[in-house]
Every structure is written in structure tokens, then in C-alpha cells.
């Protein structure tokens, strides 16, 4: 059962008719609805093509947040073998918003870091809706240090609206944890590939996304603040989020043209939530190619190239 976004109403109406016809045919075998269903399926595809070929920034934001969009756990199950999650920051507690550990990726030992939002009420509460606390970033630092020590490539999958802004998180050094994680990403002497698979929100995202290669899924977003947050600050009106999204340049196309990311991973027709397996496979191929390109580079080269990449970004924007 699909959760339809508001701009998907034409698709919803057509697929609703298909469901009704299938139900009618199952109740009365004398009724043949095959031809009509076939025609409607063609119209559904045409509607999806028409709508998704001209999504605006706000609509892409909605797709990036779609509740059925594949999350970190979905990628981990498919892309990684022998994934062994590590827990805790060795200072305060465990933070389930960041999942991190060791695994094999197509036979190669790697370190994995990702943000998990959860997919139902219970798991969303467990993972704090994908908004990490300081302990999550300090756990990421543990994994990065381990990867650097043992020469393991790092793969990070980004999907967060932003770091958790609660009082407790601030008291325990949220800003410092984000800064240290960013610094560690920039400093490791191993390949680091980052992919924004949904939302890339502010420092909460960049803390694990300062990679040698940074990619975005076609309908993901990456920004310093959410459109709602920007609208609240600029106009004191969060309902102007659509306007803010347009002006913030948050889409994959915008960020590729600005040189912030290295590439865009195409999504299936209608978004990643309509065919999770294919987008996960495509993401795996891109990661594998990136790691292959960097395999012959020394640790110093990898670190210097990564640092220079982000220094240039600040100079040239």
C-alpha cells in the first residue's frame, strides 16, 4: 500500500481504480477487466513520468522524506555482508540514530556509518527520528579511528533532518561532537565515500559526509537548514517552506552544478520508494566504482585530496 504525496493525486486516483477493478474481477469471475487494467497501468506510468520529470525543490523534499523510502537498515541488509554493529561512545551512552560497525562490501572489509530514521512509531522513537545526539557522533568517531588504524575504507549513508537540538544534547557537547566527527572524516588516511540517501540536514549530515566522493540520490536533498526552518528565520512563517526550498538550492542537480557533490544516482521511476531494490543496487555500484578508483592512492593522497576538496568548495562557491 503506497503512501501518496499530495502532488501524486492523479497517480493515486488511477491506481485506486486498478485496485477496484481487481477486486471486482476476484468477486465475479465472469467479468474480464484485463484490458481495462492494462490501459490504466499505461496511464499510471504516463502520469508518473509526467509528474516526476518536473518535480520542484519542495516536491523533492517531500519525496526525500517519504515514509516508505529505503533507510539505512535496508541498504545495510542488501549491500553489506557480515555487518557487525558497534554500540556506545565509551563516554556516556548508545545512540541508535547513528548505526555504525564493520562489514564486508562485495568481499572487501569496510567500516560503515549511517543515520537511521526508523519506519514505524516504535523504531522512530528508538532511532530518535534519525536526529543524532552527541553520543552518535562520538560513536562515529570511534569507527573512523578504527578504520584509520586498520586501513578500512569508510562508507557513510546520510539521512537526517539534522542533529538533535535538545537541551541534554547541547549540555553534552553537541557542537563539539559534530566538529570532531567532521574533523575526523577529513583526517582519515583511507577512502571515504558518502551518499545522501534521503535528507542531508545541516551539520548533522556533514559530520559523516566529508568524503573523498560525495553522491546524492536523484530525489534527495542536502542543505544547511530545513526549508521550514529557513522560512521561520527569514520570514517568521514556516508555511513559506516551498518558497524557501526553491531559493536554497537543495536538490541534487543544484548541488552538482555548484560542485558540492560528485555525482547523482538515478532513482527508479516514481522515486526510490517504488523500487527499493534497484536503487540500493545502483548505489552499491556507484560506491564500488568510487572505491575502485581510489584503491591505488596512498593514505596521504586520500587525506590531502579530501581536505583540498572542501577547502576549494569554500573558496569557489
From Swiss-Prot:
Alphabetized PROSITE patterns for the sequence: COA_CT_CTER
UniProtKB keywords: ATP-binding, Cytoplasm, Fatty acid biosynthesis, Fatty acid metabolism, Lipid biosynthesis, Lipid metabolism, Nucleotide-binding, Transferase
Annotated InterPro entries: Acetyl_CoA_COase_a_su (IPR001095), ClpP/crotonase-like_dom_sf (IPR029045), COA_CT_C (IPR011763)
Domain CoA carboxyltransferase C-terminal, first and last residues per copy: 40-293
Root EC class: transferase
Top-level lineage group: Bacteria
Pathway involvement of the protein, from the record: Lipid metabolism; malonyl-CoA biosynthesis; malonyl-CoA from acetyl-CoA: step 1/1
Reactions it catalyzes: N(6)-carboxybiotinyl-L-lysyl-[protein] + acetyl-CoA = N(6)-biotinyl-L-lysyl-[protein] + malonyl-CoA
Listed EC numbers: 2.1.3.15
Subcellular location: Cytoplasm
Chief localization: cytoplasm
SUPFAM superfamilies the UniProt entry points to: ClpP/crotonase
GO cellular component: acetyl-CoA carboxylase complex
Biological processes, Gene Ontology terms: fatty acid biosynthetic process; malonyl-CoA biosynthetic process
Keyword Nucleotide-binding attached: yes
MF (Gene Ontology): acetyl-CoA carboxylase activity; ATP binding; carboxyl- or carbamoyltransferase activity
Membership in a protein family: Belongs to the AccA family.
Primary role: Component of the acetyl coenzyme A carboxylase (ACC) complex. First, biotin carboxylase catalyzes the carboxylation of biotin on its carrier protein (BCCP) and then the CO(2) group is transferred by the carboxyltransferase to acetyl-CoA to form malonyl-CoA.
Subunit structure: Acetyl-CoA carboxylase is a heterohexamer composed of biotin carboxyl carrier protein (AccB), biotin carboxylase (AccC) and two subunits each of ACCase subunit alpha (AccA) and ACCase subunit beta (AccD).
Protein name: Acetyl-coenzyme A carboxylase carboxyl transferase subunit alpha
